[in-house]
Every structure is written in C-alpha cells, then in structure tokens.
C-alpha cells in the first residue's frame, strides 16, 4: 500500500484469442469490449487475473527467493497509477490445512458456513476463508474456556493490560500451535470456523506502469519461508504466488490506491530521490517506466540495496538502460555482503550528503519504500544526518527541516 505515512498490514477479464478469459470481473462475468471502472473491484467483487509470467530474480545460491510476477488484466478495465498497490486475496497452504484438520479430528468434508456465511466444507473454509496463520482473540478465549486450569497462563495474557505481552507471546505462533499444545480443546467444525479471522488481503506495491505494460500488472515479491518454534512457516500470499498458482489459476485482485505516493507531473522539473532496498524497489520501477513513457523533466536518483550484486541485483539491465538514456540521473547501490563491512542504503545516503542536500534545496521529493522495522528508521536517521551536516544545522534545525518536507509532501514513505 502506498501513501504518505506508513501502512500497517498484518511478513496472501476479456476473452483472449484462444477463447480463454485472461481476466474476469465480479462473479466471473466477462466484460468484452466494455471497460469497467477500477472502482468496481474490491474484496467482494475482485478482478480475477491470470498469471502471465513468473521469474525468479534472486540467483539460486541466494538465501532469498525474490520473484517477478506479471498478471494479465486484459479486458478487465482495471486501471492504476504508479504508487498504487495490488491487493491479492490468497488461499492457505493445503498442507497446513490438513494439519489443522487432523488436530481438530475432522475429515474436512463436514458442512459449515464460511466467514461470509456461504455454505461449504470445513476444508474449503480453511483454505479460502479462514486466516489460520493469524490468531484471533476469540480463538484464544475459546481455548481457555475449554481447557481451564492448564491454560491459566494463557488466560492471564488475555486481559487488556497485557496486550503487549500477548503480542510478544503470539509472535511466530499460528492456530496449529495452539491446537497441538491444547489437544483437550475440542471444537465442533462450525464452532471452530467462528473463532477465526477472515483470510487477510496482502498488498503489494505495483512494479509497473500501464503506459509501459498496458493491461498487465507487475509485482516484485519476496517469498517468505522461515522456521519458528521448531516448525517451518510460510508466508501465505508469497508462497501462494510462488507455489500454488499456474497460468490457469484465477487470482482475486483489486487496486489499493496510493493517493500520496505519486510522481510530480511529467512537465515539472522537481527532482525525485527514490530509496528502495530489496522489494522496496517495486514502486520505483513503476516510477521510472512512467517517467520514460512521459519523457518526464527533472532529475531522478535511485538508491537500491540488497545482499550481493552477483545474486540479488534485481532489474540491473533496466537501471543501466535508464542511466544511459537519462531517465535516471544517478544510481547508488549498496550490497551488504560484498565487502567485509556491511554497507546499506543509509550509508550511501550519508556518503552523498553534499549532493543530496543540494537536491533537497532544489525542492526534491524524497521517497522511501520497504521495511518499516529497521530500514525506514535507519534511512530517516541518515536523512536527518545529511541535512544537519551538509546544511550546517543543529539537530533541532534538521528536525524542523524534515518536518517542513513532510508538510510540503516532499518526504513520502511506503513502509510495511
């Protein structure tokens, strides 16, 4: 999701020439020759896009698995702007669903109503409706009620005063952990469904411009896989895209507008500074495609960082081409493990203090996209340091300078 400020989201069609619909609208209706407003698409009425292309960006030897996806929007009429996000409504991992069913002592064929009150089977509700990797407090309360004294410690965490302690306790835990820890907690199928949250929409910053790639949308996604408490954990949406879709899958999507995360008008001479390490590069790829298509005036400076140039330099040929054509004025790269001392984008920002401050004095907009937990804070500190040192200001004056940038909408963040 792209906007001024931070986003807080829970680390998931017209007929083609062969007659198969690349993208369908609500309820599977085809919109042959009739372009529909993007506003009609939402969670209840998503655009059903199809996978057009999937490419692994990170090399096989990289510890990361970052991928490039292209979804076909042909005939849907769905439009977006650089800076928008694509909402993806994923399904859960079938293997995890089977584990939950086994822990519940259910076959999966039991009749239930899902969380939209639609009749279905328990298995299908767990696949498509319930957020079984996220814990709802109703579920924990049900565990406490059913188990009694053995769950006393858990009960103590459910009082409002222990909210932070509960959040720490739940970190890295999923529904399956509690079902296995408290096997004496027995649930009827419908009762269990009622204790769950709805499967969460995942928002991905769009990494393409419609002017460069009409009727398609590109995503740059890090596949999340990790271990916690002795179990392998999977990012719901990222592994849905990486493992559970193919060219025939209808992927429910809609646009989430990034109203404040926008480029200046093409004719404006306003410089833009873009800081997007890792998958934070996504909206800036869209920005540069848009600038190339509109022959935008004004300078552009990109900061990108990853683990290694050899394994994780995403879209390298595109950046080099933009430099050569003048669409991109400057490119600074930070590959953290390519030298003894780890170097990140914030270090590159500080190294370029004099020139970067000169751009800011020319009215540059400073954009940041990516990790909110560490990167965004580190970049923010670097920005303050640049302004204080190159601008020969006190820390208080640098803070006031950044505050003015925010007021003037020249400091824009899409962090998550």
Where on the chain are the PLM-derived regions?
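FNR-like FAD-binding dehydrogenase module
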Residues: 1-416
């Amino acid at each position: 999701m792209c906007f001024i400020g931070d986003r807080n989201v829970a680390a998931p069609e017209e007929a083609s020439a062969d007659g198969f619909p690349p993208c369908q609208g609500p309820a599977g209706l085809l919109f042959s020759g009739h372009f529909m407003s993007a506003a009609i698409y939402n969670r209840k009425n998503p655009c059903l896009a199809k996978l057009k292309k999937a490419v692994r960006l990170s090399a096989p030897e990289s510890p990361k698995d970052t991928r490039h996806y292209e979804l076909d929007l042909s005939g849907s009429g769905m439009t977006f702007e650089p800076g928008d996000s694509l909402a993806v409504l994923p399904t859960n991992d079938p293997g995890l669903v089977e584990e939950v069913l086994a822990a519940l002592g259910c076959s999966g064929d039991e009749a239930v109503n899902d969380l939209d009150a639609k009749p279905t089977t328990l298995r299908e509700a767990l696949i498509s409706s319930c957020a079984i990797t996220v814990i709802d407090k109703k579920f924990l309360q049900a565990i406490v009620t059913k188990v009694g004294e053995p769950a006393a410690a858990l009960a103590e965490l459910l009082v409002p005063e222990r909210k932070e302690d509960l959040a720490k306790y739940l970190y890295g835990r999923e529904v399956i952990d509690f079902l296995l820890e408290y096997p004496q907690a027995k649930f009827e199928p419908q009762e269990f469904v009622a204790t769950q949250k709805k499967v969460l929409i995942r928002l991905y910053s769009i990494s393409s411009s419609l002017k460069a790639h009409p009727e398609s949308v590109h995503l740059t996604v890090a596949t999340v896989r990790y271990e916690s408490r002795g179990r392998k954990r999977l990012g719901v949406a990222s592994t849905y895209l990486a493992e559970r879709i193919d060219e025939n899958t209808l992927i429910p999507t809609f646009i989430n507008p990034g109203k404040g995360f926008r480029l200046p008008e093409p004719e404006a001479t306003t410089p833009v500074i873009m800081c997007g390490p890792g998958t934070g590069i996504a909206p800036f790829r869209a920005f540069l495609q848009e600038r190339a298509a509109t022959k935008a005036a004004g300078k552009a400076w990109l900061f990108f960082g990853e683990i290694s140039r050899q394994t994780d330099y995403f879209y390298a040929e595109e950046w080099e081409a933009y430099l050569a054509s003048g669409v991109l004025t400057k490119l600074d790269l930070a590959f953290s493990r390519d030298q003894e001392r780890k170097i990140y984008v914030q270090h590159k920002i500080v190294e370029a203090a004099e020139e970067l401050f000169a751009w800011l004095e020319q009215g540059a907009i400073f954009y940041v996209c990516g990790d909110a937990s560490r990167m965004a804070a580190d970049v923010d500190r670097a920005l303050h340091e640049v302004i204080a040192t190159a601008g020969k200001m006190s820390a208080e004056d640098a803070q006031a300078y950044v505050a003015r940038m925010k007021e003037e909408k020249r400091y824009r963040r899409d962090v998550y």
